Structures are given as C-alpha cells and as structure tokens.
Amino acid sequence: MILYRNCPICGSESLRGFAIDTQRKGPHISRVECLKCKLVFANPMADSQELADYYTGYYEKDHYESVDYKRLILNHFQRIEKLDKSEINKEARFLSKLEQESKFLDIGCGLGLGLAYAHQLKCELYATEFDLGALEFVKNHFPVKTFQGDIWEAKYPDNHFDFIHISHVIEHVLDPKAYISEMMRILKPGGYLAIGTPNISSKLYRFHRWSKLIRMNIPDVIDGLEHTFIFPKKLLRSLCEEQGLVVDDHYTHNFGEKFSNLIHYKMPLKKKLNRLIQNVFQVNQWLISRKPVF
C-alpha cells in the first residue's frame, strides 16, 4: 500500500478525509481530498502489484454479472453495426473527431464498446487491457491488435495513433500525469485523445456527501472502490493542457442526450435508472483534446 502525506498531483499538504467504505469489497476503503486542487484520491492506495492482482479476471467478478453483461455488450455490437457516421457522432459525441480508417487505440478496452464504434468506421484497431478474458472476448469479435498489460509495457512508437480512446481508466491508474504524457507521446500531431472519467465536482457527489454530514454520518464511497483518483473538471483539463494538449470539447451528459440513447438499450430497468441518475447529476465527464501540429 502507498500512504500519501501530500497531494500526488499538486504536492499540497492540505488534505482532509473525504469518504470511507468498509462494507463493499475492493482494494481501497478510504479517500481524502486535496483542499488546493480538489482532487479526491484513495489513501492509502494499493500499489501496482495489488492493483494487477485485483484486475485479474475483472470482468468475471460478481459485480459485473459476467454472462448477462457480455450479452448486453453483444446487443450493443449488433445495434452499432447499423449506425452511420452521423448517428455515431450523435450517440457517442466523444468520438465525433474520429475519422474513418484512422489508427485507433483503445486503452483499457474492457469488453470493446469503443472498438465497436471504431470498427464500424473501418478504423485500424489496437487495444490494451489487463484482463485476459476481456482481450479474448474482443479478439473474437473484431480484427484488433491487442496487448495485455499497461500502456508503458506496450512500447508503442512515437506519433503513432490518430485517435486514442480511454474510457473509465484514468481513475484506475497510479500516475495519471505520466499516463497523459505517454498518450501525448504516441499520438500523432493533429491526433485526438478522448478521456472519459467520473466528475467529482458533480452535483450528485456533493449532494451525497453533504446529506451524510448533515445527519452526522461519515460519507461513504458511491463509485468503485478500485478507483485511485477522481478528478474535478477543472483539474482534468489543466493536466491535459500542462502536457501541451489543446482541449476541443469538455462536457458532461445531459438528461435528454442519454435518455434518447437509453430508450434503445436492451438492459434491465434498474441499470437504466442508475445510468439516468448518473447523467442527470452529471457524474461522468468527457474531455476531447488534440495534439498540436508544429
């Protein structure tokens, strides 16, 4: 375990307790907040070996209800096969800068939803993922070059990809600054990076925390206990700009946008309601940036 006395992003010593959760299973139980940059992070934090052990068989764990979840993903694949470029842009705004036949890298590809969109646009597909079962799943459905492990170990060449997609991964890593720097290195000049991650500055996080404090209860963790860092929008943007990336779009889903998508999704009503709640309160953010052409 790693114990932080200072904020791992800005170095400030001004930290305070933020949440604790001892009821659920996960590599972390407590979080702190940096009062300077507003980052929320696990402290103590699992080290690289502990996280690697946790992510082994990640998509087979009980909380993913593995068989049903994979069936849901396959339903998405079938639906995406019928979409054209304009429909993909409307449904997945974070891919609006993705051009057909681009060289596309999905970091932490999971079960391949991002790959499905890129494949529909006839892109050349690459993917990294820790979970071997997930990699086997995507290879069974797409012509994708895969790497099992972290982005550093893949050793991709400089200026190699037209588009990098990293959805709900940056909040799982141990060094987000270095991660963004590495993605900047392997991105072509003029290429795009799309980062999807929770938004700690959302109304739902604030409401949940203060509703607990008012009742004299210790706030618990409402997202995944495996998360290492949860970013406010302003901080995520500044981390990208510090690496020289130019932010083109930075948004959270509004209710109407996601509701129109969810009508067509084949998933249990409970999951649909959960997704709606997350998007009504702007729990998740997308940041799309590009590497300048010098």
What is each stretch, according to the model?
Residues 1-159, 163-167, 177-180, 250-253, ...:
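Conserved N-terminal segment of class I S-adenosyl-L-methionine
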Residues 152, 166, 174-182, 192-294:
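S-adenosyl-L-methionine-dependent methyltransferase catalytic module, highlighting the catalytic core
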